[in-house]
A protein has these predicted regions:
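N-terminal carbohydrate-binding accessory modules
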Residues: 32-103, 114-134, 141
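Sec-dependent signal peptide cleavage junction
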Residues: 20-35
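Bacterial N-terminal signal peptides
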Residues: 12-22
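Structural recognition of the beta-strand scaffold that forms the well-ordered cores
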Residues: 62-69, 100-106, 110, 164-171, ...
Length: 334
């Protein structure tokens, strides 16, 4: 089977005090294991060992080949593209191309909708003629199912195809441009709402190892130009402190399911030596820059001094820097 690079680079962190680099000896393919028959033993949970390797229950390093499929975060109430293609066929294509891990962007809003059993704000964007399985009657042109029921059909099909799932909170509110919002909370949905949503999700699927991981928040970012919207990383309990928020939310999630991998992305900026988070972004008189900058979610300078601490669940932590190749923007390291 072809080995592909996971789109989001995974750097496991097995020790609370150390940022660890991933190793290069993955050995066991999840897809190959699951392809023979649907898993019914719920024993595919993953962990991180002291060598910063993601391993299975027997300590064997695993090879994760991932892709993303969005839609649930933007208001479609389903994967985008199901308005014209058959969802089951699309999932088969993902598996047939050798992918064994599917990262699915979500919003806090849609998880809370499902948690509370609220009706869909809009009919899921499903073509009921190409997706008769997603209708109440099971016929072409039928009544489209509730979005959570459709989601659970996707989970079932992924389980049968040997595809594992990681959701990420792409934004608090469901919106096509929600990823532009720098933090994990807004005026509409609080940090507590975010934690409640993910804790509910972890509890709901705690007996189903199709759901292997949660990426707590896509691309925390922001600069000192708007300080109350800047994700920072330090030892404070400030509402904008990403480290504190991530540890708090992870504790809620792992209380419900201690087997889940917890992905923690970085921030956008970090203060340079001699400065702190009160500094302006730049002094235009001297053109002095006070922060190290990088991609949204790609800055882990804070983790060196203030590593994420998940306590007894440290073996579930994966630092997940968000990085892009030169086709997006040429960088000096390419």
């Amino acid at each position: 089977m072809l080995h592909h690079i996971f789109q989001k680079v995974l750097l496991p962190a097995a020790l609370a005090g150390t940022m660890l680099a991933g190793t290069s000896a993955p050995a066991v393919s999840l897809a190959a294991q699951a392809a023979t028959q649907p898993d019914s033993y719920h024993d595919d949970w993953l962990h991180v060992n002291d060598n910063a390797e993601i391993v299975d229950k027997d300590g064997n390093p695993v090879w994760i080949t991932g892709c993303n499929w969005f839609g649930y975060n933007v208001g479609s109430q389903v994967f985008d593209g199901v308005w014209s293609q058959n969802m089951h066929d699309m999932l088969r294509q993902i598996a047939d191309h050798g992918f064994n891990f599917l990262r699915i962007p979500m919003s806090t809003e849609i998880l809370l909708q499902w948690k509370n059993g609220d009706p869909d704000p809009a009919t899921p964007k499903v073509n009921q003629y190409t997706n008769p399985e997603l209708t109440e009657e099971g016929i072409e042109g039928g009544t489209i199912k509730y979005s959570f029921d459709i989601w659970n059909m996707a989970v079932k099909w992924c389980r049968e195809l040997g595809i594992k799932i990681m959701i990420d909170i792409h934004s608090a509110e469901t919106a096509s441009a929600g990823h532009q919002v720098s933090l994990w909370y807004t005026d509409k949905f609080s940090t507590e709402d975010w934690c409640d949503a993910l804790a509910w999700f972890a509890d709901y699927y705690k007996d189903d190892d199709t759901i292997l991981a949660i990426d707590l928040k896509n691309e925390p970012h922001g600069t000192a130009d708007v300080k109350d919207q800047m994700a920072k990383w330090d030892d404070s309990t400030d509402p904008t402190n990403w480290k504190y928020a991530a540890e708090t939310c992870a504790a809620r999630v792992l209380e419900k399911n201690p087997e889940l991998l917890i992905m923690v992305e970085g921030t956008e900026v970090y203060p340079k030596e001699g400065y702190d988070w009160t500094a302006p972004r730049i002094d235009y008189t001297t053109m002095t820059e006070y922060y190290y900058g990088t991609w949204w979610g790609g800055n882990f300078r804070g983790a060196k001094k203030y590593p994420i601490d998940l306590g007894k669940y440290q073996s579930q932590l994966v630092y997940s820097p968000h990085d892009y190749g030169p086709l997006v923007w040429e960088q000096k390291w390419f």
